């Protein structure tokens, strides 16, 4: 009964809530506030709502991650404790139930990632759009230029050249990533003008740039079931397992994007990556495997002997890095040479010079400080009746549906509390 409309009582005053931004958090906040009995104005400067949402998950929309709260929070490296109340108020199961109730059947895939059965993100956007309309939300395709506040708190927003009065305002403008979808970063500017601390913004869940000359040669090579280790100042920082991709500028893919969220000291630390192409085998077992392969190709040139072990595109690079003459016959390769080959297969180094640009990031790390937001309501501690939801808050997570769940949960909590009637 979470989404039943509340009725207004005689000793309360119906209020107006302005929601800025019609992304995941803003749509959830707007509909939820309307169901509390508020008149809701949803401002979106794009022609269509949910533009960024429509391209998430490569157009499939990874709606959430079907795991319990403790596992969920383990995937939130930045301020996880802030989310206890939000996830308690609107859980992963609540998200799944919500979309099923809106007529969007879901499925759970590897890694507990939840997608619409149709594999079409547009179904999620359309369901939210029709839901907020059904809830009575007024959608205004106008660009908000200012959040209006006086000494006692919020008074409204400036949009379309005029002031729209509002008792409460929810800022759900997202981050600075994917600017082509309309992300401008305006919300951070408004928050600072209203006295909030905005922690430094940077790209997160972003490809990594490498000066390594081998990356362009390996461009387009996709690898599955590999291990990636990131070193910060030569100390092991993070290790992950999964899929990755070589690009003309460096590294990308889910494994790399998740690793990037751990790399937070670009201004004062150096980073490098090591790829283990055969993580299921330790060095001794891999050496045995290589010996077995070699025994079947004794008179073959070394460069032609690795076809069963590696993708074709990778072989010339590994041969070069091993230091073994590509024309040397397999039957003359020494144990020391095999050890050099094993090292390349288990510790393939890639230099990292920096993250990709913030415009290419899936999310923006940093944002309005959680110390200045009430975690049980999402209301500002600085400005009464001002609320925040979604990516604008200084909370971010790994790939896998976690960031969208944060948007649903914080959006719900902000909408629920902002929509409560004022007692007379």
Q: In which residue ranges do the predicted regions lie?
A:
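N-terminal Rossmann-like FAD-binding beta1-loop-alpha1 element of flavoenzymes
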Residues: 16-42, 414-419
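Short hydrophobic core segments
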Residues: 18-20, 43, 144, 164-179, ...
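An anion/pyrophosphate-binding glycine-rich loop and adjacent beta-alpha core
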Residues: 47-55, 63, 69-70, 105, ...
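A glycine-rich dinucleotide-binding beta-alpha-beta segment and adjacent secondary-structure elements
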Residues: 140-143, 316-396
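A conserved short coil-to-beta-strand element within the FAD-binding core of flavoproteins
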Residues: 140-153
């Amino acid at each position: 009964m979470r989404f039943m409309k509340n009725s207004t009582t005689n000793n309360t005053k119906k209020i107006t809530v302005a929601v800025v931004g019609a992304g995941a958090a803003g749509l959830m906040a707007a509909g939820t506030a309307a169901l509390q009995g508020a008149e809701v104005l949803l401002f979106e400067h794009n022609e269509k709502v949910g533009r960024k949402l429509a391209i998430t998950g490569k157009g499939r929309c990874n709606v959430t991650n079907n795991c319990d709260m403790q596992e969920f929070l383990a995937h939130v490296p930045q301020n996880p404790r802030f989310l206890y109340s939000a996830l308690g108020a609107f859980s992963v199961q609540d998200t799944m139930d919500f979309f099923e109730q809106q007529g969007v059947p879901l499925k759970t895939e590897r890694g507990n990632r939840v997608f619409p059965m149709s594999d079409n993100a547009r179904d999620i956007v359309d369901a939210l759009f029709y839901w907020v309309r059904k809830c009575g939300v007024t959608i205004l395709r106008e660009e908000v230029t200012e959040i209006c506040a006086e000494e006692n708190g919020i008074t409204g927003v400036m949009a379309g050249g005029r002031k729209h009065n509002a008792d409460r305002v929810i800022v759900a403008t997202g981050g600075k990533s994917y600017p082509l979808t309309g992300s401008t970063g305006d919300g951070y500017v408004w928050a600072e003008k209203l006295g909030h601390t905005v922690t430094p913004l940077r790209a997160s869940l972003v490809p990594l740039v490498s000066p390594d000359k081998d990356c362009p040669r390996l461009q387009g090579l996709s690898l599955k079931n590999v291990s990636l280790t990131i070193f910060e100042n030569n100390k092991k920082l993070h290790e992950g397992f999964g899929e990755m991709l070589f690009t003309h500028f460096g590294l990308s893919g889910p494994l790399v994007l998740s690793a990037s969220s751990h790399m937070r000291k670009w201004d004062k630390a150096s980073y490098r990556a090591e790829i283990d192409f055969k993580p299921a085998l330790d060095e001794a077992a891999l050496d045995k495997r290589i010996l077995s392969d070699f025994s079947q190709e004794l008179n073959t040139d070394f460069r032609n002997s690795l076809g069963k072990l590696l993708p074709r595109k990778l072989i010339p690079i590994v041969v070069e890095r091993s230091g073994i003459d590509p024309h040397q016959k397999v039957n003359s390769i020494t144990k020391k040479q095999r050890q050099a080959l094993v090292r390349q297969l288990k510790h393939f180094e890639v230099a990292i010079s920096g993250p990709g640009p913030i415009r290419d990031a899936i999310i923006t790390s940093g944002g309005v400080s959680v110390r200045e937001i009430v975690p049980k309501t999402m209301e500002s501690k600085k400005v009464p009746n001002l609320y925040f939801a979604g990516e604008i808050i200084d909370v971010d997570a790994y790939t896998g549906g976690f960031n969208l769940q944060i948007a649903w949960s914080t959006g719900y909590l902000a909408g629920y509390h902002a929509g409560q009637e004022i007692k007379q």
